[in-house]
């Protein structure tokens, strides 16, 4: 119980503590959500084959850990909790792209003004190579309870993926009621633990 209380206190006072060391687990989950029908119903999925290379495994701040980190994603390995749908997406969408990998790199990070006892938030700039085209995407991040999550939006038209979109829309025309959207939500998550903080108790 004492360890739990100390961990919570350390998290709440992290912005006021000095000498913290942030440690990244090294694992990363990459997820996405595509949309279908005029009601814009979301279909969530995850990539299951990811090679993540952190800029550093530990550092004094998020920037030291994350800026410069890279990820390579095998789009042939996905999970939407429906194996038939997985096969269709791979065959009729991902295999219609110019390559079967997505490459990403965090190139910049800007933190929002810190509000005590609230999650850390800000914006990441991610250089993304998708369908053999490279663009920089902003992603909003949030850090709370040792969990770092970033989310953004990808427009398939920006990456010249119209042919792949047309392919999946045609294949799933009835299920999607004739509409598959070009915007896709993307996100990633990793665990970051704050250790060795110099915490000063305040009365």
Predicted regions and their residues:
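Sec-dependent N-terminal signal peptides
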Residues: 4-13
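Low-complexity, acidic/polar, glycine-enriched regions of mature
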Residues: 17-203
């Amino acid at each position: 119980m004492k360890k739990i209380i100390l961990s919570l206190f350390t998290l709440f006072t992290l912005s006021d503590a000095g000498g913290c060391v942030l440690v990244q687990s090294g694992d990363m989950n990459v997820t996405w959500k595509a949309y279908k029908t005029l009601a814009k119903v979301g279909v969530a999925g995850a990539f299951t084959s990811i090679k993540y290379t952190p800029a550093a495994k530990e550092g004094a701040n998020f920037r030291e850990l994350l800026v410069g980190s890279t990820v390579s994603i095998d789009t042939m390995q996905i999970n939407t909790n429906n194996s038939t749908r997985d096969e269709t997406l791979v065959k009729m969408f991902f295999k219609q792209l110019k390559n079967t990998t997505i490459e990403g790199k965090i190139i910049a990070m800007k933190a929002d003004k810190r509000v005590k006892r609230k999650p850390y938030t800000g914006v990441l700039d991610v250089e993304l190579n998708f369908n053999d085209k490279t663009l920089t995407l902003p992603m909003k991040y949030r850090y709370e309870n040792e969990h770092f999550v970033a989310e953004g939006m990808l427009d398939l038209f920006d990456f010249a993926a119209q042919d792949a979109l047309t392919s999946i829309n045609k294949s799933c025309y009835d299920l999607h009621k004739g509409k598959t959207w070009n915007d896709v939500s993307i996100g990633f998550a990793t665990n970051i633990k704050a250790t060795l903080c110099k915490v000063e108790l305040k009365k």
